[in-house]
């Protein structure tokens, strides 16, 4: 598991029961595997995924072998604190979990950290990457170029927000100026994903759910 969210650990128990194989995750994610109700699910999450069955995880080390592939484990916080990526240096593959998700950036979860995601992506961009394997976009060729494109867009957005903040505009006015009205994701998720979360995380330099 790249991280502890319900849509990533949901099949663990069935896989273990069917194949009897270990499930690996970062050490901090293991309590969520053993007790999935530690995940505070919103209504939309309960409708789509609900809480998974309990499963037993094993702490992943600095590398892992899978067939003829040798993956290096990279700590990749931002989407969650326990997020990891897997890098295969010979094939130049990067498995990004929920960290990459395409070159555009509009909506942020309330428990994500925009600036931390940006710094992690910049770290990953130092790798030689031929193909990104993304949870949302599938196989993305020219992976390093895709990362650099996303980084550039995120830096431009960050700079615009900070510039307007320094001119005295409040977060909601900045969101309206740069991104316009909220979209369907804000309504469907009850604000869990929103444009405002993106602006707030840049404006205050932290996760929106930690802003007083």
Feature-to-residue mapping (PLM):
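Active-site HxH/HxHxD metal-binding segment of metal-dependent hydrolases
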Residues: 1-64
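Short coil/loop residues immediately preceding or within conserved phosphate-binding loops
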Residues: 61, 68-71
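Metallo-beta-lactamase
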Residues: 70-77, 81-160
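Accessory terminal helices/loops
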Residues: 126-130, 139-212
